[in-house]
């Protein structure tokens, strides 16, 4: 039995715990260490067991004096004195296995021993301490759960009320539904028109841009071809330069001719530069060279062919300039169309902004109404909190009154127990007195009969000698 699942308490700890946690009032003050360990009193141990059962299971005091109703007893008055002890043993036999004590016997109630009682009380105190700890945690959890449920219900009700109010606020009044519908239709129509115009104008601008890009690529291709032809002409000129015969007369005549041609070329070059400054890179001026070729008419023919080619190039350049001017005119037209579209878009945006201002104003009105509703709700909540505080204060007062009533009931029960004990003692004393009186009466009657018999015998003796004489 030494391998226990609970600690063994010292007698001082057991007495201190019983005084502070189990017993109250005069019972706690009158309890001493000698009542449980030095000279163990069964009635004190019975009182402690009863208080522990009342604390743990809530068993009332009159239950220990109740006769079982499921058994037929012929003479119940015989069991009246033994009934509280028997009920106490039955309850303790059920309770102590919970405290990990499995060897409780009837003799531990009728004739208790100090060591076994200390072990039983150690197990009981360990269980009571564990129960109090778990009970506090459970009560705290229960209180938190109750408060959370109340708060949850309050929040649910408040949420439902607010949802109803929000639905009421979000619904458009009947007198404003037509205006609201008209505004929404106008907004949708404006959005559709703006998106359609924007798509159409963007498509047109994309087409114009793609066309301009194709024209620019074509012109760059033609310019590259002209550059290639000019490079070939330069190569031919260099080849002809190497074949020229250096004769002074022919050179002089050739120089004069070349001067005239150079003047003509310079004049034509000046005209080309003045008219086509933007295409200076396309038409490169032939370098002034001292061509001393008089005997080669083929070279002059080639130069004439080059002049014709230059004229054709200039005509192409003029055509390109005309095309560029027409493209610029079309671009200006596109810009004017874009400006008109921008004006239309700004007008539509102004209409949208006015509609948004109206909607914003309505939303502000709704928000203001919501704010007033929330303020009213907060005031109601404050009033409700004040009422709740009053109710809690009243409930605390009720609990205090109940606690006082319970204390009064306990004191009344204690007085009743004392009165019953006094009654039982008086009854036992009277019964003993009656028994002694009956015994004395019987003894007196027996002695009287003996004396009467002796007197009769004496009389007979006295009478017998007289008769004989």
From Swiss-Prot:
Q: Which residues form a coiled coil?
A: 135-444
Q: Which Pfam families match?
A: Nuf2 (PF03800)
Keywords in UniProt for this one?
Cell cycle, Cell division, Centromere, Chromosome, Coiled coil, Cytoplasm, Cytoskeleton, Kinetochore, Mitosis, Nucleus
The record's annotation in Gene3D superfamilies points to: Ncd80 complex, Nuf2 subunit (1.10.418.60)
Family per record = Belongs to the NUF2 family.
* Species this protein is from: Gallus gallus (Chicken)
Q: Does the keyword Cytoplasm apply?
A: yes
* GO MF assignments: microtubule binding; protein-containing complex binding
Cellular component aspect of the GO annotation: centrosome; cytoplasm; Ndc80 complex; nucleus
Name the UniProt record assigns to this protein: Kinetochore protein Nuf2
Q: Which GO terms describe its biological process?
A: attachment of mitotic spindle microtubules to kinetochore; cell division; kinetochore organization; meiotic chromosome segregation; mitotic spindle organization
Q: How does it assemble?
A: Component of the NDC80 complex, which is composed of at least NDC80/HEC1 and CDCA1.
């Amino acid at each position: 039995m030494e391998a226990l699942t609970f600690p063994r308490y010292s007698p001082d700890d057991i007495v201190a715990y019983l005084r502070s946690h189990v017993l109250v009032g005069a019972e706690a003050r009158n309890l001493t260490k000698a009542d449980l360990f030095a000279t163990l009193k069964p009635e004190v141990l019975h009182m402690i067991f009863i208080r522990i059962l009342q604390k743990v299971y809530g068993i009332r005091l009159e239950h220990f004096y109740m006769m079982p109703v499921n058994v037929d007893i012929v003479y119940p008055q015989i069991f009246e004195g033994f009934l509280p002890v028997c009920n106490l043993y039955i309850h303790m036999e059920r309770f102590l296995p919970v405290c990990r004590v499995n060897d409780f016997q009837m003799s531990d109630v009728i004739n208790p021993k100090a060591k076994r009682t200390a072990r039983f009380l150690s197990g009981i105190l360990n269980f009571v301490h564990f129960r109090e700890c778990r009970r506090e945690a459970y009560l705290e959890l229960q209180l938190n759960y109750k408060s959370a449920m109340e708060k949850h219900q309050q929040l649910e009700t408040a949420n439902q009320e607010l949802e109803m109010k929000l639905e009421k606020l979000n619904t458009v009044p009947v007198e404003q539904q037509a205006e609201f519908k008209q505004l929404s239709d106008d907004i949708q129509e404006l959005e559709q028109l703006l998106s359609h115009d924007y798509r159409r104008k963007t498509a047109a601008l994309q087409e114009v841009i793609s066309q301009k890009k194709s024209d620019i690529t074509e012109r760059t291709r033609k310019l590259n071809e002209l550059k290639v032809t000019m490079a070939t002409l330069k190569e031919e000129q260099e080849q002809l330069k190497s074949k020229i015969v250096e004769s002074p007369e022919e050179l002089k005549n050739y120089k004069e001719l070349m001067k005239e041609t150079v003047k003509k070329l310079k004049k034509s070059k000046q005209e080309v530069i003045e008219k086509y400054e933007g295409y200076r890179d396309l038409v490169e001026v032939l370098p002034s060279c001292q061509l001393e070729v008089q005997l080669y008419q083929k070279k002059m023919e080639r130069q004439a062919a080059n002049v014709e080619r230059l004229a054709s190039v200039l005509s192409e350049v003029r055509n390109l300039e005309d095309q560029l001017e027409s493209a610029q005119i079309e671009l200006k037209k596109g810009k004017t169309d874009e400006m008109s579209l921008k004006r239309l878009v700004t007008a539509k945006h102004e209409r949208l902004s006015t509609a948004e201002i109206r909607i914003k104003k309505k939303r502000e009105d709704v928000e203001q109404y919501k704010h007033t509703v929330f303020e009213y709700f907060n005031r109601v909540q404050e009033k409700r909190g004040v009422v709740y505080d009053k109710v809690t204060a009243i409930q605390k007062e009720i609990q205090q009154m109940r606690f006082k009533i319970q204390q009064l009931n306990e004191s009344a029960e204690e007085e009743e127990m004392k009165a019953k004990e006094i009654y039982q003692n008086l009854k036992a004393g009277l019964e003993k007195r009656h028994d002694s009186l009956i015994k004395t009466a019987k003894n007196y009657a027996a002695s009287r009969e003996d004396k009467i018999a002796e007197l009769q015998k004496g009389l007979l003796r006295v009478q017998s000698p007289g008769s004989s004489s």
